Amino acid sequence: PRFISVGYVDDTELVRFDSDAENPRYEPRARWMEQVEPEYWERNTQIAKDNEQSSRVDLRTLLRYYNQSAGGSHTIQRMYGCDVGSDGRLLRGYEQVAYDGCDYIALNEDLKTWTAADMAALITKHKWEQAGAAERRRAYLEGACVEWLSRHLKNGNATLLRTDSPKAHVTHHSRPEDKVTLRCWALGFYPADITLTWQLNGEELTQDMELVETRPAGDGTFQKWASVVVPLGKEQYYTCHVYHQGLPKPLTLRWEPPPSAVSNTVIIAVLVVLGAAIVTGAVVAFVMMRRRNTGGKGGDYALAPGSQTSDLSLPDCKVMVHDPHSLA
């Protein structure tokens, strides 16, 4: 089985371990992490390798709990970390475990008790209660987690507290039955929180809007899109609105017809005065050009929603770490 461990502060990846790498080691993914002492990488590489082995045991345990065969693909996901406020104090700690994409067990907000999602998870819950797992996790979340988050914020504040404003545009995609899809794209933004909405004459179209999850662009920024289906010829009544921390004010966009379509229309209008025969030829030429140009300019980048306020003081930040204890 493949084991991957990733650490984040807010939307920025810090460190990564991948058991399928040629030389599996904990590696920095953010530039400021290169300042960390070598002992950190040695220590956490060994922890990751230990966790890889314990995760194999956990996987076999869950296969037994759910009476499943070893064939096929199965996944255990763990996420735990801490949220701190602008004063550096702990706001919330958490640990969540999922199996094959479904909730399994989670640490409650009191950091003292667990919630099991099903009968199999109850077995793990009872074992963890007897072993004092919640107390150990609470000690980590209130101690080392907060300390490391403070250190990351100090070393990486230029990256973590930056804002990259989204670049937005609207594309036009043909559909059958005199309908078109208008898709509003937001690209290259950071942090990931963003809101995209479509409006018709000032009324929000939340029920009729298709929205994708915010996606990483691979360069430290994010992308998202939202689309609506509208009647052909009514595109100008629809507006896309983009809200993001990096914008001085929200963006309002409409679909803009390509310049070639506008210039063709002007040519036809001028030729009309030259006589019926010439007008007929001009109309035929215009229709042919329109057919050649029919279709939207698509793209496979995306844009997505989620609101963020613009606060110049230090925002609340989160850190996620992966250091599992056994489910067995």
UniProtKB/Swiss-Prot annotation:
GO terms for cellular component: external side of plasma membrane; lumenal side of endoplasmic reticulum membrane; MHC class I protein complex; phagocytic vesicle membrane. This is H-2 class I histocompatibility antigen, K-Q alpha chain. Signal peptide: none annotated. GO terms for molecular function: peptide antigen binding. Keywords: Disulfide bond, Glycoprotein, Immunity, Membrane, MHC I, Phosphoprotein, Transmembrane, Transmembrane helix. The chain crosses the membrane at residues 266-289. Residues 256-265 are annotated as: Connecting peptide. GO terms for biological process: antigen processing and presentation of endogenous peptide antigen via MHC class I via ER pathway, TAP-dependent; antigen processing and presentation of exogenous peptide antigen via MHC class I; defense response to bacterium; inner ear development; negative regulation of neuron projection development; positive regulation of T cell mediated cytotoxicity; T cell mediated cytotoxicity. Residues 1-265 are extracellular. Residues 290-328 are cytoplasmic. It is a single-pass type I membrane protein. Its main location: membrane. The modification Phosphoserine is found at S310, S313. Belongs to the MHC class I family. Heterodimer of an alpha chain and a beta chain (beta-2-microglobulin).
